[in-house]
Amino acid sequence: MNELIKHKLELLPDSPGCYLHKDKNGTIIYVGKAKNLKNRVRSYFHGSHNTKTELLVSEIEDFEYIVTTSNTEALLLEINLIQENMPKYNIRLKDDKSYPYIKITNERYPRLMITRQVKKSDGTYFGPYPDSGAATEIKRLLDRLFPFKKCTNPANKVCFYYHLGQCNAHTVCQTNKAYWDSLREDVKQFLNGKDNKIVNGLTEKMKSAAMTMEFERAAEYRDLIEAISLLRTKQRVIHQDMKDRDVFGYFVDKGWMCVQVFFVRNGKLIQRDVNMFPYYNEPEEDFLTYIGQFYQDTKHFLPKEVFIPQDIDAKSVETIVGCKIVKPQRGEKKQLVNLAIKNARVSLQQKFDLLEKDIRKTHGAIENLGNLLNIPKPVRIEAFDNSNIQGTSPVAAMVVFVNGKPSKKDYRKFKIKTVIGPDDYASMREVIHRRYSRVLKDGLTPPDLIVIDGGQGQVNIARDVIENQLGLAIPIAGLQKNDKHQTHELLFGDPLEVVELPRNSEEFFLLHRIQDEVHRFAITFHRQLRSKNSFSSKLDGITGLGPKRKQLLMKHFKSLPNIQKADIEDIIMCGIPRTVAESLRDSLNDPPK
């Protein structure tokens, strides 16, 4: 488990939602749902697991989550996210037709039915539902509440359900199109959670039946009311109109703005985009700028309509974007915008919590390091490393960490000037002298601690330069690596001693990072220099090819093989005379003698 995951686990909410595990490349490898995100996601990184789960956990380098308002929403969102991303560790779900919908047919006497195929022209659809059991349970309740056609009898012959008040598909009922349209709308309102009208009606019927001593009928009404209270299903992540739309929500705090975009395709929320950035104008103005840039990016498909929050001017967005802009006022559409806003708030808060934790962690690390070495808190640390291969192109590098963070503007590179051959001690002496002579000469602020990537010999050389030659008093520590080239020991004191440093401590991680960074910086510089020297040596001796022209070739072609493959005209285009270009080609392409 890496440090990022450790921090994120501490900040997870107790809300329901979906989580997305990612690998080192940022690819989503698993999507899951949870009643409680905090408990579920943490469970992956604690305790024992079966072989399959352990394999999944071994690949997790990061995770994201989307907060929902119910477990049902989380389940349906999970389905959509799996279908969209096809994570390799998820069971391969079938396509949309495998999920059941409840349908009201467009017949003269409409029927309620369960189907797995959606054809918008032949009915009104509700769903999809997680499984056939859930759809069947809801349909049974709808059958008891709404008198759609339930029989195969001809219209002039009433059925058993008619006598129960559950089927009005008969001529004796004198129903018309307006009646069925009204009933269809009642079902839609009911499934969207607006069930007060029906519950109130059932409550009155229950009371009336009890007053007339019809206790069995009253019990039926009571059971219906209880069934409705258990249902209360609000599927904000699904829309019945099957439209493509983008839903924007944003939240601002502490000078930062977070914008969340939900991508709804064919009525289903399948993906989200999150962006956080500092804002400098009014939030509404910066949001308009953001949404304009968002759709300038060709990877973002422009949908039929875009949902935006209430405080944004729709006409301004429409002018920028060029499609229908909607500010939902009520119902599930407004709830979806609110969900985007809620997730924007959660994401921004997580960013602040991570920053605060990181600050506490790095401040704690440098404070603990100071206490461990019995020196003032080392706010500024300068670290050095040498790099050469058998004495060729010897270089050194310095990296700087301020308050536990790399300060790259202060990094420095050194070409070794006075040392011939592979001599790490002499190279270290030269570099330390050059660096801190400049500090004295220019009145620069000296570091609170110098770290040498090396053992006792290099540290003693550095101390001799600092104390005896330059008269400075700067603490110097050494970092030794083991056979696997990993940070192993911290050397400090006079005489030098190994300082016990717990491997799981924040100060150890800080020193490990410093050592890795200075080594990386030195190696990179050395490779660049070797490549440049190799390039130049091959071009030496070619008449008319001086340092400036070599530099032009290096800048344009990057490597000798590229020059060898280039046409004469390409070389001339760099500002090289034709005669020199021809000599160059002949020289590079002649076989060695």
Curated annotation (Swiss-Prot):
Entry keyword set: Cytoplasm, DNA damage, DNA excision, DNA repair, Excision nuclease, SOS response
Q: One Pfam family of this protein, by short name?
A: GIY-YIG
Which SMART domains does this chain map to? GIYc
Protein's name in the database: UvrABC system protein C
Primary localization: cytoplasm
Supply the CDD domains for this chain. GIY-YIG_UvrC_Cho
Report the locations given in the UniProt record: Cytoplasm
Question: What is its quaternary makeup?
Answer: Interacts with UvrB in an incision complex.
Its source organism is Streptococcus agalactiae serotype Ia (strain ATCC 27591 / A909 / CDC SS700)
Q: Name one GO molecular function term.
A: excinuclease ABC activity
User: What sequence ranges are listed for the domain UVR?
Assistant: 196-231
What is the primary gene name for this protein? uvrC
Q: What does this protein do?
A: The UvrABC repair system catalyzes the recognition and processing of DNA lesions. UvrC both incises the 5' and 3' sides of the lesion. The N-terminal half is responsible for the 3' incision and the C-terminal half is responsible for the 5' incision.
One CC-aspect GO term: cytoplasm
Q: Which Gene3D superfamilies match?
A: 5' to 3' exonuclease, C-terminal subdomain, GIY-YIG endonuclease, UVR domain, UvrC, RNAse H endonuclease domain
InterPro entries from the UniProt entry: GIY-YIG_endonuc, GIY-YIG_endonuc_sf, GIY-YIG_UvrC_Cho, RuvA_2-like, UVR_dom, UVR_dom_sf, UvrABC_protein_C, UvrC
Q: Which family does it belong to?
A: Belongs to the UvrC family.
Start and end residues of each GIY-YIG domain: 14-91
Kindly state a single biological-process term from the GO annotations of this entry: SOS response
